């Protein structure tokens, strides 16, 4: 390079000069770190090379009409579901697969063995009493083949493209007891039982463009479901409250005039309005009542029911002038729950403004069993959590209404996407709610020991037993589920936003990804391609190092020396070195002999050809000290070599 060319580059800042030296320690190999990343999924007409849905993207549809009864005497649910399944795929379908996750609680389920230890209780699973294929006004009985938590139905004739099959299924099951019910169950309280009811009807498995039918068995991880509309009714004892996904459509039949008036007041109020107070919880009443709900464009619905619920609500202010209701139901002994609706309202409003508008009219937080579990526009949370934990869990679980309820990730394979993406948006909600009342987020999901997240992650990266983020969800044991699936995944996005791309590039890309894949089924490859394309960066080094592997980062300053005498410019060369396999952009802070300092931003490409690079710093005053990552923002495993001084 000619001297005037070097001078031209130095005038606009700092340029990395290739040093002839290589690292004398560590395992850094630039060809390995910066090799093209294999996405594991080739672009097609259904999924484009830039990460968007392709011009011929398709997905099937499942619409549900459900009528069920919850009988507290037998602790059972019985019901009938009519499923309208539309085949939008280009191929005819000879069979249909359904999920019957209640079979997870059978003694012979795969989930029992995969858990590694005996659960505290069992049920007989879900009984499919009658299964019919509806044709006009007639119905033909079909015999399902039951395989663990799946049911396969062979059709008399293949279902062609564009056609709809209608299934009518009568079923029943016993609701598992808390705590061994896990994601669903019942518990007793002083005011009566609380039921958190989920996986409560046969649900269609997904047939997609990647694997065809994808009915992985339910091993107590999460779900992959099709979108559609729901019309469901739940019959309970007359004095019970039912809180469900979607919108209650028969208020006049199940609520008193006083409750309806209070609900109308809540729809206009930014402050929490009590719909049913603790003093209005009353004892047993004869008879039954049916609560009727509808929800559009959802992949699932769940509900909670109890005679012991206090109920409050407030208006949510959503983009484009829309409003909705944030609601909470909880027993009187749930001491921290008086602010639950405030937490819920704030999270939904901020997530809507920052990332993507909340698509449904209501959001609900339920105190009861199955604590810390999410369903569309509804969360099941713990009764006894202290205030900070109640806030964090409420924000996290309702945040799942974005991931995976709106952006329909395959949780059963890629739990890190919904948990990590959701924990990521929670980090900023914790910082912003009520001027940081509960910030920063430090809980079981993110930096659980309370320190700097980039330090907290280091033992996980160093542990050879820790699985990489890109692991099938069912293979991640409980020890690593929160550290990897939640924490590492979320921190990867925080680092991508704050250190690699910057909010000015990350935020528009992330919003565009959500909008492109709303109510669709993106994969990890779709996300990686989208962020590469939208941000204008090849992030292969990051996807490989942080997501496909547990590579560690060790950047070092090894020398400070003056410019060669033949240079027309005055300045210093600061030698920075990569000593392990992960690299990322970093700030270099240089201090001059005159006491002033300057920050220099080094891109990841500083180490794209070699482990050691000389960074030119133009200044009349010589550099006497150089520090990498002075503000402690990146997960450098050895900070002792980040600081170099000539004095």
Label for each model-derived stretch:
Residues 26-28, 76, 86, 114-190, ...:
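A surface-exposed beta-strand-loop module
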Residues 27-99:
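Early extracytoplasmic/domain-onset interaction patches
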Residues 30-41, 45-47, 61, 293, ...:
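Hydrophobic alpha-helical and helix-loop surface patches within well-folded domains
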Residues 81-83, 87, 98-102, 155, ...:
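Short, hydrophobic/aromatic-enriched beta-strand segments in well-ordered soluble domains
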Residues 93-138, 237-240, 591, 595-601:
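Solvent-exposed beta-hairpin/edge-strand motifs
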Residues 108-122, 172-230, 251, 632-647:
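Glycine/proline-rich low-complexity spacer/linker segments in large multi-domain proteins
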Residues 202-208, 212, 219-395, 424, ...:
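Hydrophobic helix-coil surface modules that form long, contiguous segments used
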Residues 243-244, 556, 562-629:
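Beta-strand-rich binding/interaction modules
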């Amino acid at each position: 390079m000619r001297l005037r060319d070097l001078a031209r580059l130095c005038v606009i800042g700092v340029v990395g000069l290739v040093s002839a030296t290589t690292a004398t320690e560590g395992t850094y190999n630039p060809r390995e770190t910066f090799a093209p990343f294999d996405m594991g999924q080739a672009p097609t007409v259904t999924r484009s090379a830039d990460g968007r849905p392709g011009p011929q993207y398709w997905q099937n549809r499942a619409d549900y009409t459900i009528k069920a009864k919850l009988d507290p005497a037998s602790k059972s649910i019985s019901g009938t579901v009519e499923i309208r399944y539309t085949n939008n795929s280009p191929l005819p379908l000879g069979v249909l697969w359904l999920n019957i996750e209640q079979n997870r609680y059978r003694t012979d389920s795969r989930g029992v063995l995969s858990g590694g230890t005996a659960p505290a209780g069992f049920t007989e699973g879900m009984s499919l009493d009658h299964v019919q294929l509806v044709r006009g006004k007639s119905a033909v009985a079909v015999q399902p083949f039951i395989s663990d938590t799946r049911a396969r139905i062979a059709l008399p004739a293949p279902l062609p493209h564009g056609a709809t099959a209608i299934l009518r299924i009568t079923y029943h099951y016993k609701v598992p007891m808390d705590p061994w019910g896990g994601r669903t169950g019942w518990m007793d309280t002083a005011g009566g039982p609380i039921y958190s009811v989920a996986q409560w009807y046969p649900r269609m498995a997904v047939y997609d463009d990647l694997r065809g039918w994808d009915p992985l068995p339910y091993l107590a991880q999460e779900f992959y479901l099709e979108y559609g509309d729901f019309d469901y009714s739940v019959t309970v004892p007359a004095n019970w409250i039912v809180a469900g996904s979607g919108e209650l459509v028969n208020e006049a039949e199940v609520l008193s005039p006083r409750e309806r008036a209070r609900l109308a007041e809540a729809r206009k109020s930014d402050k929490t309005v009590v719909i049913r107070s603790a003093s209005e919880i009353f004892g047993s009443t004869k008879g039954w009542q049916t609560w009727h709900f509808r929800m559009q464009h959802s992949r699932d619905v769940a509900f909670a029911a109890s005679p012991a619920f206090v109920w409050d609500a407030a208006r949510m202010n959503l983009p484009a002038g829309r409003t909705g209701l944030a609601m909470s139901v909880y027993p009187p002994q749930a001491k921290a729950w008086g602010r639950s609706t405030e937490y819920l309202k704030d999270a939904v409003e901020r997530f809507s403004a920052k990332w993507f508008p909340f698509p449904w009219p209501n959001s609900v937080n339920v105190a009861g069993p199955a604590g810390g579990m999410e369903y569309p526009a509804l969360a099941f949370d713990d009764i006894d959590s202290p205030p900070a934990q109640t806030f964090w869990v409420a924000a996290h679980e309702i945040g799942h209404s974005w991931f995976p309820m709106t952006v329909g990730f395959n949780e059963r394979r890629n739990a890190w996407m919904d948990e990590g993406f959701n924990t990521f948006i929670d980090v900023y909600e914790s910082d912003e709610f009520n001027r940081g009342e509960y910030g920063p987020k430090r809980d079981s999901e993110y930096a659980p020991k309370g320190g700097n997240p980039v330090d907290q992650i280091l033992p996980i990266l160093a542990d050879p037993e820790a699985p990489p983020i890109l692991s099938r969800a069912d293979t991640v044991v409980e020890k690593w589920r929160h550290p990897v699936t939640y924490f590492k995944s979320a921190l990867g996005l925080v680092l991508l936003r704050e250190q690699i791309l910057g909010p000015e590039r990350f935020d528009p890309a992330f919003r565009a990804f959500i909008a492109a894949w709303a109510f669709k089924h993106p994969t990890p490859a779709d996300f990686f391609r989208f962020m590469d394309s939208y941000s204008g960066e090849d992030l292969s080094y990051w996807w490989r190092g942080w997501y496909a592997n547990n590579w560690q980062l060790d950047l070092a300053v090894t020398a400070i020396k003056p410019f060669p005498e033949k240079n027309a410019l005055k300045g210093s060369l600061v030698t920075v070195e990569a000593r392990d396999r992960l690299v990322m952009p970093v700030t270099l802070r240089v201090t001059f002999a005159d006491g002033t300092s300057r920050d220099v931003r080094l891109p990841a490409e500083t180490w794209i050809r070699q482990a050691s690079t000389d960074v030119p710093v133009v200044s009349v005053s010589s550099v006497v000290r150089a520090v990498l990552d002075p503000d402690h923002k990146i997960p450098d495993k050895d900070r002792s070599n980040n600081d170099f001084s000539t004095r």
